[in-house]
Structures are given as C-alpha cells and as structure tokens.
C-alpha cells in the first residue's frame, strides 16, 4: 500500500485522469468502470433523464471462459492482420466495408481512413459479441446489448470531422462554407431542441399533408372526431372508426393521397370517422387512462353510432390506439354494451410479455421515478411528458438512421435536410399527460396486467379482453422493433371470436403504410392459428404486394349492405364544426 506523499500523489493523479486504467477490454468489469466514470462526468445527464439504461447492469455478470477465449482469439487474429496490412499499405486486405456509413469513395481510396473504418468495425463486432455472450437473464443481456450499441454507434469515425474524409473534402472544396453552414444548422437545432431530419418548411398540415376532404363533427377536451367525405355514390351501412396512437399525430394514416390509408378505405365505399387527439397542454396534465377510455374512445364510438344510425360499427386501432380501443370495448362489455361489429388491430400490444427494444427502458425504479415526477406521486403536481423527450427517445432506438446520420449530413457536411413527409410527421411530436403515461407504463409494460381477466379496473369495471366477442383482424409487421410481430400474434390467445392474423413485411410504420399501387413488399397469410407464432409462419403463404386488399376484403364482409352515401357531414345533433384536419392536429408540442 502506498503511504505518505506517494499515496497523495497517486490519489491526485487518479483524480486528474478522466478514465482510469482498468482491466482489459474483454473484461465486463472494464465496461462497468467506463460506464460509471462516464456517468460521473459533466454533460452526461441525458441518459438518466431520458431513461436510457447505463451499464450498471454489468455488475456481477460473467462470460464463459471458453466463449470469451474464442472472441479474444478471433479479435486478435483479425486485429493483427489489419495492423500488418496497414503497415504494408495493402488496402484490399481490409475487404469491402459493408457499412453504408463508409460507402463513399473517400473512405475506399484514402488508406488511413479506410483502415480507421476497418478497425472501428472490428472493435464494434468484438464489443457486440461480448455483449451477446454475457451470462445474465434476458432483460439484463438486452440492456447491455442496447447500451453497447449506443456507445458503438456514437463512436463511429464517420461522426467526427477529424476522422471523416468526406466532410474534410467538403470543407476544403467549399472554402470553409460547409463548416459554417453546419455550425449554423447545429445552432438552429439547439434552439429547437432536436436534430432536423427534414425540411419542415416544405410541409403544412392541411395543405400538403393530411388533405383527405372531411369535417370535424365533434370535439371535447381530448379529441376531435373527423368524418370524411364519401368518394363513392354508395357506402356500406356500418362505418369504420379509426383510432390512431395518441403518442403521434393521426396523419401518418393520411400523409399523401397516394399513400393514405384513410383515403383508400373511403375509396372502397366506407364511411370513415377518425379520432384526432388533442396535443395536451398544462390544463390536461392530470388526465388519466380512464379519462382517455371514457371521454375519448367510448365517446367517439357513441358519436359515430349516432351519426351513422347504426347500433354496431367497425373499429380500428393502431399501435397504442389498439390498446385503447380494446380496453374501451372491454369496459363497454362489462357494462352490457357491445357496439362493435368488428375490430382491426394494427401493430398492437395486448400481451406485453415481449415489448421488444422498449423493454430496456422499463423497470420498477424507472416507473417509480416517472410516477413521482409526472404522475402526481407523493403529493407532487402532475406534469406532462414532453413530446420532444419522447421523440428523442424513439430516435435513439435507431441512432444511426435517426440521429448520427443527420449529425454527419447537417453539421459536419453543412447540408440542408431534404423534404420528406414521413420524417416531417415523425418530428411533429405530441405531449402526454403524466398520469396517463404512468398508468400505461406500470400496468402494461411493467406488470403486464391488461391480459389478465379482471386484474385491472378501468372506468369502475373489471377488464376482460375475452369479452370482445367480435370478428377481429390482427396485423403485425415482421421487422417491427416497437411491437414485435410475435407479440402482436399473442393477441390471438386473448380474444374470443373469429380471428384473422396477417403478417406484413418491413417495420412499425412502413409495414402498415404500404399502398397497393406501389406494388412493394409482401405479406403472409395463414387461416390456422396455432399456439406458436413460429408454427403460424411455417405454414403461412407469402403474397407479393400490400396487405391492404386482404384487409379491405375482410372489412367489406363486416360492413353491411350498401346504401346511398350521406350528402352532409354529421347529423342534426352533431353538425360540422370546421373542415378537416381540424385545429387539434396543428397544435405543436
């Protein structure tokens, strides 16, 4: 043990080093130490504030010696080969850089940068293999993998001016103008509080997005109800009520005429009503899950039935909108009411046993923190979950695509983002009431109680999803990272009546918004519903193109005979208030 001046000097030297000497990089203790030291430095508060997990989960985890040895041996072999190739100037020894971040000629033809990219990819592979090899429960392993991937993605040489040859070339060719423009872009984004992903000035809700013709026929403090103008002379008797997620603006379902699911359904001869959620302000900070069920979902069903003159209507829920719809119908069933002729659930979770990547954000400590700061716990005032925080969290689920890609293009290269309607919608964030959010976190993501008959009481009655005894169409997207398709399939075990499950290609949004005219992607069908989703897929038939025609054919069978299309919006009780898309969707977070 060091004593006297030596000990003091050693202590002082240790304090002056931002990252102390630790065991080798193949020891999980190293990762834990890096994480703790990083969390102790200035400017690191974002991770804790946003709920992004750190690496404290690494405490006590191990890697099997044989597996660790294999990773070490493979790493050292490839590292030595790269080092020798660099010393000899053999660029071809790196092999092709199979990563779009390094696809440009500047990376391929400039040896120092080519080797920098190759060493980075080698280290990234090794760290990922180590994260996958830890001996821990599934949730801990997923958190470690997520934290490692965040660090690895952030440290790409493409993200820094000093190690990005494309940005350096632009800097020289533009005489410094690219850097000047990049700094200007960064300062504007700092003012806005988010990274620009598109040229938002190119879009306006109601002018060139969300343009399907219609009117607001009802509104309260939670939502506006839109009714769309018929595009056919005759329409099915039963209307369709669409309930989008309240964590986003509704117009993902009505971006452009050629990609609008709303317009497509109207063109098939359906009267369409749609919930346009209010963007909560301080006056709604205390709103609860029960409020959204009673005063939004159930109220929308009542108004759509009244205007259409139908005892039963078809109902569609998208993402958390599907969770809200299912809860509302179960509440109504407990009251002896059955207003739905059919239900459509798009990328919806009812069984929250597998919540995909979002599971890394949810544990008892995090939920308690949210309840104390947002949900009115311990006598504290209720507050809003700001849409900007939610949007940033979702962006970091795909950091290379939605964060670092724009850091490089906008800041290092000084480019202006191109107009893109989907990214305009993605950046149009909405707030959430704290109590609503906390209830949703605890009772679904954390405790998975919605699937248990009678476990939850909502609006004063016990909830039993099996009481939703109507034909149900369930859709999942195969590459969905928010609602894994196998989790969407799990709803088939909870609902009671004639069920149809269809699987689409692509992800959470692109899989859903897949108009037939583009003839893109594919979908899978299987009339059987075995217990295992893997068994379902093994017996499924793949069909080229959109799943929309399959769904609209099914929906037509639930919608009743056709009659003359209504000449006016609403009825004597519910008159048109203003043209679609209405005021609520235009409110900014």
From Swiss-Prot:
<dbReference type="GO" id="GO:0042619">
    <property type="term" value="P:poly-hydroxybutyrate biosynthetic process"/>
</dbReference>
<comment type="subunit">
    <text>Monomer.</text>
</comment>
<keyword id="KW-0963">Cytoplasm</keyword>
<dbReference type="GO" id="GO:0005737">
    <property type="term" value="C:cytoplasm"/>
</dbReference>
<keyword id="KW-0808">Transferase</keyword>
<comment type="pathway">
    <text>Biopolymer metabolism; poly-(R)-3-hydroxybutanoate biosynthesis.</text>
</comment>
<dbReference type="InterPro" id="IPR010963">
    <property type="entry name" value="PHA_synth_I"/>
</dbReference>
<dbReference type="InterPro" id="IPR029058">
    <property type="entry name" value="AB_hydrolase_fold"/>
</dbReference>
<dbReference type="InterPro" id="IPR051321">
    <property type="entry name" value="PHA/PHB_synthase"/>
</dbReference>
<protein>
    <recommendedName>
        <fullName>Poly(3-hydroxyalkanoate) polymerase subunit PhaC</fullName>
        <ecNumber>2.3.1.-</ecNumber>
    </recommendedName>
</protein>
<keyword id="KW-0012">Acyltransferase</keyword>
<dbReference type="Pfam" id="PF07167">
    <property type="entry name" value="PhaC_N"/>
</dbReference>
<dbReference type="InterPro" id="IPR010941">
    <property type="entry name" value="PhaC_N"/>
</dbReference>
<dbReference type="GO" id="GO:0016746">
    <property type="term" value="F:acyltransferase activity"/>
</dbReference>
<comment type="function">
    <text>Polymerizes (R)-3-hydroxybutyryl-CoA to create polyhydroxybutyrate (PHB) which consists of thousands of hydroxybutyrate molecules linked end to end. PHB serves as an intracellular energy reserve material when cells grow under conditions of nutrient limitation.</text>
</comment>
<feature type="region of interest" description="Disordered">
    <location>
        <begin position="1"/>
        <end position="23"/>
    </location>
</feature>
<comment type="similarity">
    <text>Belongs to the PHA/PHB synthase family. Type I PhaC subfamily.</text>
</comment>
<feature type="active site">
    <location>
        <position position="319"/>
    </location>
</feature>
<keyword id="KW-0583">PHB biosynthesis</keyword>
């Amino acid at each position: 043990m060091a004593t006297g001046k030596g000990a003091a000097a050693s202590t002082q030297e240790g304090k002056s080093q931002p990252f102390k000497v630790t065991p080798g990089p193949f020891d999980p203790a190293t990762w834990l130490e890096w994480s703790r030291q990083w969390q102790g430095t200035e400017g690191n508060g974002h991770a804790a504030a946003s709920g992004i997990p750190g690496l404290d989960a690494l405490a006590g985890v191990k890697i099997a010696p044989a597996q660790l040895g294999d990773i070490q041996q493979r790493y050292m072999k490839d590292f030595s080969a790269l080092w020798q190739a660099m010393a000899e100037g053999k660029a071809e020894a790196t092999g092709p850089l199979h990563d779009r971040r390094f696809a440009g000629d500047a990376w391929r033809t400039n040896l120092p940068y080519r080797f920098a990219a190759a060493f980075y990819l080698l280290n990234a592979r090794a760290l990922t293999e180590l994260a996958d090899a830890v001996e821990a429960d599934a949730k801990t392993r997923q958190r470690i993998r997520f934290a490692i991937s965040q660090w690895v993605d952030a440290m790409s040489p493409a993200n820094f001016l000093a190690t990005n040859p494309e940005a350096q070339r632009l800097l020289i060719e533009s005489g410094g103008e690219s850097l000047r423009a990049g700094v200007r872009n960064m300062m504007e984004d700092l003012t806005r509080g988010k990274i620009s992903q598109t040229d938002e000035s190119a879009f306006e809700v109601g002018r060139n997005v969300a343009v399907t013709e219609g009117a607001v026929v009802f509104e309260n403090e939670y939502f506006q109800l839109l009714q769309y103008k018929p595009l056919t002379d005759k329409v099915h008797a039963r209307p369709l009520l669409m309930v989008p997620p309240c964590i986003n603006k509704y117009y993902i379902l009505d971006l452009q005429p050629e990609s609008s699911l709303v317009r497509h359904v109207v063109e098939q001869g359906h009267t369409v009503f749609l919930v346009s959620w209010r963007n909560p302000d301080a006056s709604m900070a205390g709103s609860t899950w029960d409020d959204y069920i009673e005063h939004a979902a159930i109220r929308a069903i009542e108004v759509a039935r009244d205007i259409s003159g139908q005892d039963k209507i078809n109902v569609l829920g998208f993402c958390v909108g599907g969770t809200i719809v299912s809860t509302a119908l179960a509440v109504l069933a407990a009251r002896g009411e059955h207003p739905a002729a059919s239900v459509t659930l798009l990328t919806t979770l009812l069984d929250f046993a597998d919540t995909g990547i979002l599971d890394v954000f949810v544990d008892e400590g995090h939920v308690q923190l949210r309840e104390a700061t947002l949900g009115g716990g311990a006598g504290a005032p209720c507050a809003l979950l700001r849409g900007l925080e939610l949007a940033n969290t979702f962006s970091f689920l795909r950091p290379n695509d939605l964060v670092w890609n724009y850091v490089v293009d906008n800041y290092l290269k000084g480019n202006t983002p191109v107009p893109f309607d989907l990214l305009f919608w993605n950046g149009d964030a909405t707030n959430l009431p704290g109590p609503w959010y906390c209830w949703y976190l605890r009772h679904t993501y954390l405790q998975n109680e919605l699937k248990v008959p009678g476990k939850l009481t909502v609006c004063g009655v016990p909830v039993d999803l099996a009481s939703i005894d109507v034909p149900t169409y369930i859709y999942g997207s195969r590459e969905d990272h928010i609602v894994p398709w196998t989790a969407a399939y799990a709803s088939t075990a909870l609902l009671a009546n004639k069920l149809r499950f269809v699987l689409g290609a692509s992800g959470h949004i692109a899989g859903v918004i897949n108009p037939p005219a583009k003839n893109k992607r594919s979908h899978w069908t299987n009339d059987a519903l075995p217990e295992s989703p893997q068994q379902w897929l093994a017996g499924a038939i793949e069909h080229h193109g959109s799943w929309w025609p399959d769904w609209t054919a099914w929906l037509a069978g639930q919608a009743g005979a056709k009659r003359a299309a209504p000449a006016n919006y609403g009825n004597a009780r519910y008159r048109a208030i203003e043209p679609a898309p209405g005021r609520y969707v235009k409110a900014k977070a």
